[in-house]
């Protein structure tokens, strides 16, 4: 337990603005950068999450996340530490071991891939989850299919949230029932103390910008890069693209670097991926843009088939043409055994773009 302080060491007194950690970004689209987080950044986020997610001293967290990343090192650990709760610590994710320990736990946090693997375990049942009060997902998009299947199987609704190395947590779906419903496909509302805006007209898609006491101090030894990432009025440009719906829920559309511009038109991959993921035989998809001699970029989809299925590319394209503008429809579909991911479960689209860059002879 973390409820009492050890008398074997003298606590180090630190000021809120002193550097606490340098956390390197995931780097799915380029070179990783060292985000400098202060003690004040970490404390403000920990206190906010403790209150918002209702951390208690009798909580038991199943901790399976790597501690080189903000999700495992801060988001999961700090809530338990601040509340004086217990942690069951795993050095890696083992679905059978997690299921075996669920009956004595109350909180679990994981990336979407872990929830898919839990659903594949026969022992993952409502009975196994009887003491659980909170399942949190983040670090990568959670498929609506996984969201729905998990609720049906466990009786629990996953709480999806949004954050990044530079900011820790920014938004969260509601925890308390009185604060609203947890909506699949969204990351909820800005957390208390966090301001969030979208650089676009109301309801439209644009760049997400944030500010608050949780925002980092800058990138380690990269002053020019730090300056580039903040607006003139002090808002941090997350590099994510999203929108705020009429009910105030934040939707993440994707990374700005993943935006495809084909023939002068913008294509947001998440829109096309959501449609593909709902089609027969498709387990998941990644939509990318690769060099095209006529259009600048050509839209390409990379699919993973469901077990035992063989997706019909022509049929999928035909269905897409009935639902979205023609310029958004992939010019090619590829079926692969799995999508490349980093350690936090994010699809590495940069690797897919590199693999298919010569497809149209535009590289």
Regions found by a protein language model. Name each.
Residues 175, 186-193, 201-229, 265-267:
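Conserved ATP/PPi-binding loop(s) of AMP-dependent carboxylate-activating enzymes
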Residues 200, 212, 217-218, 225, ...:
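AMP-binding/adenylate-forming catalytic core of the ANL superfamily
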Residues 43-60, 68-107, 121-123:
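Conserved AMP-binding/adenylation subdomain of ANL enzymes
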Residues 139, 163, 188, 240, ...:
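Active-site glycine-centered loops adjacent to acidic/histidine catalytic or metal-binding residues
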Residues 20-44:
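Conserved AMP-binding A3 loop
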Residues 19, 25-28, 61, 67, ...:
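Conserved S/T- and glycine-rich ATP-binding loop of Class I adenylate-forming
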Residues 53, 102-110, 119-181, 195:
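Gly/Ser/Thr-rich phosphate-binding loop
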Residues 5-24, 31, 54-60:
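Conserved pre-ATP/AMP-binding loop-to-beta segment of ANL
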């Amino acid at each position: 337990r973390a409820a009492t302080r050890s008398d074997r060491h003298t606590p180090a007194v630190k000021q809120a603005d002193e550097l606490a950690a340098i956390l390197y970004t995931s780097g799915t689209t380029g070179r990783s950068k060292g985000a400098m987080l202060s003690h004040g950044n970490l404390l403000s986020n920990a206190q906010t999450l403790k209150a918002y997610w209702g951390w208690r001293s009798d909580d038991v967290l199943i901790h399976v996340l790597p501690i080189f990343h903000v999700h495992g090192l801060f988001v999961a650990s700090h809530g338990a530490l601040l509340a004086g709760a217990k942690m069951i610590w795993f050095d890696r994710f083992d679905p059978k071991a997690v299921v075996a320990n669920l009956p004595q736990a109350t909180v679990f946090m994981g990336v979407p891939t872990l929830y898919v693997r839990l659903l594949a375990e026969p022992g993952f049942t409502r009975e196994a989850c009887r003491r659980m009060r909170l399942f949190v997902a983040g670090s990568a998009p959670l498929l609506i299919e996984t969201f729905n299947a998990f609720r049906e199987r466990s009786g629990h609704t996953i709480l999806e949230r949004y954050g990044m190395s530079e900011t820790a947590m920014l938004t969260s779906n509601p925890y308390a029932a009185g604060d609203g419903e947890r909506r699949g496909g969204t990351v909820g509302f800005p957390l208390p103390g966090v301001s969030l805006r979208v650089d676009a007209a109301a309801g439209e898609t644009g760049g997400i910008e944030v500010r608050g006491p949780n925002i980092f101090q800058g990138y380690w030894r990269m002053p020019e890069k730090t300056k580039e990432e903040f607006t003139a009025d002090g808002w941090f440009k997350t590099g994510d693209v999203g929108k705020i719906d009429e009910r105030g829920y934040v939707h993440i559309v994707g990374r700005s670097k993943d935006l495809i511009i084909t023939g002068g038109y913008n294509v947001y991959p998440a829109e096309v991926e959501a449609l593909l993921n709902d089609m027969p035989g498709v387990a998941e998809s990644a939509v990318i843009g690769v060099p095209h001699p006529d259009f600048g970029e050509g839209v390409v989809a990379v699919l993973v088939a469901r077990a035992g299925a063989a997706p019909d590319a022509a049929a999928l394209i035909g269905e897409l043409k009935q639902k979205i503008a023609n310029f958004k429809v992939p010019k090619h579909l590829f079926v692969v055994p799995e999508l490349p991911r980093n350690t936090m479960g994010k699809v590495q689209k940069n690797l897919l773009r590199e693999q298919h860059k010569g497809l149209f002879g535009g590289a």
